[in-house]
């Protein structure tokens, strides 16, 4: 379970959110809503440890994340605004690299399957620098199909993704929740309209 209590963030003397509290349980899909500038990305970065908070506490599995950082990061997959892919490597090599640093045992076939899921079949050996922005985003998203992490935190994962790609990702997110995972994301698109697993947390007015 992810627990956030009394979380406050201030940027340039402006309060983005104050005394924010929520709990997220395994099996939930959580969409962070709010206008631009209300702190959606800031919230995700604070939870992942990449951003600073004014005050508040974040717990994972009952432990403060600062005291169990290694365990938390083993359970976390974070995809931010930037794709995080290495432009000099191919799509296949990028996924192989990420799996190796996470000490995940992954076969070549599993990597090819993940790239097929995101519509990159036939582009596996193309250097990422030669792919479009949307295709580079897909390389990053392919990590989700290989992920063994429980907690997925995704900042605008649907950017530059077509309608069919959105449907595929929506199904993957729902499957992850069904398997006891947690998906926490920001997006400007309507998703999971009929899902009882969906929760929305709104920032700002």
From Swiss-Prot:
Record-linked Gene3D superfamilies: P-loop containing nucleotide triphosphate hydrolases
A GO-annotated cellular component: plasma membrane
Locations listed in the record: Cell inner membrane
Residues spanning the signal sequence: none
Keywords from the named record: ATP-binding, Cell inner membrane, Cell membrane, Cytochrome c-type biogenesis, Membrane, Nucleotide-binding, Translocase, Transport
Entry-linked Pfam families: ABC_tran
GO molecular function: ABC-type heme transporter activity; ATP binding; ATP hydrolysis activity
EC number assigned by the record: 7.6.2.5
Binding site for ATP: 34-41
Gene Ontology biological process terms, A to Z: cytochrome complex assembly
Entry membrane topology: Peripheral membrane protein
Catalytic reaction list: heme b(in) + ATP + H2O = heme b(out) + ADP + phosphate + H(+)
Ranges where the ABC transporter domain occurs: 2-204
Family per record: Belongs to the ABC transporter superfamily. CcmA exporter (TC 3.A.1.107) family.
Subunit structure: The complex is composed of two ATP-binding proteins (CcmA) and two transmembrane proteins (CcmB).
Function as written in the Swiss-Prot or TrEMBL entry: Part of the ABC transporter complex CcmAB involved in the biogenesis of c-type cytochromes; once thought to export heme, this seems not to be the case, but its exact role is uncertain. Responsible for energy coupling to the transport system.
Protein name, per record: Cytochrome c biogenesis ATP-binding export protein CcmA
Organism: Vibrio parahaemolyticus serotype O3:K6 (strain RIMD 2210633)
């Amino acid at each position: 379970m992810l627990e956030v209590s009394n979380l406050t963030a201030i940027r340039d003397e402006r309060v983005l959110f104050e005394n924010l509290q929520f709990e997220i349980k395994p099996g939930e899909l959580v969409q962070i809503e709010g206008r631009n500038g209300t702190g959606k990305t800031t919230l995700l970065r604070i939870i992942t440890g990449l951003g600073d908070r004014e005050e508040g506490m974040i717990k994972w599995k009952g432990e403060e994340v600062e005291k169990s950082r290694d365990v938390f990061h083993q359970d976390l997959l974070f995809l931010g605004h930037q794709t995080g892919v290495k432009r000099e490597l191919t799509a296949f090599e990028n996924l192989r690299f990420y799996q190796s640093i996470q000490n995940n045992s992954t076969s070549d076939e599993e990597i090819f399957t993940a790239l097929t899921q995101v519509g990159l079949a036939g582009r596996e050996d193309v250097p990422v620098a030669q792919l479009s922005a949307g295709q580079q985003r897909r390389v990053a998203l392919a990590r989700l199909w290989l992920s063994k992490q429980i907690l997925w935190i995704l900042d605008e994962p649907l950017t530059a993704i077509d309608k069919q790609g959105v449907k595929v990702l929506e199904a993957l997110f729902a499957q992850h929740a069904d398997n006891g995972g947690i998906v926490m994301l920001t997006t400007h698109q309507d998703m999971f309209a009929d899902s009882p697993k969906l929760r929305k947390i709104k920032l700002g007015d």
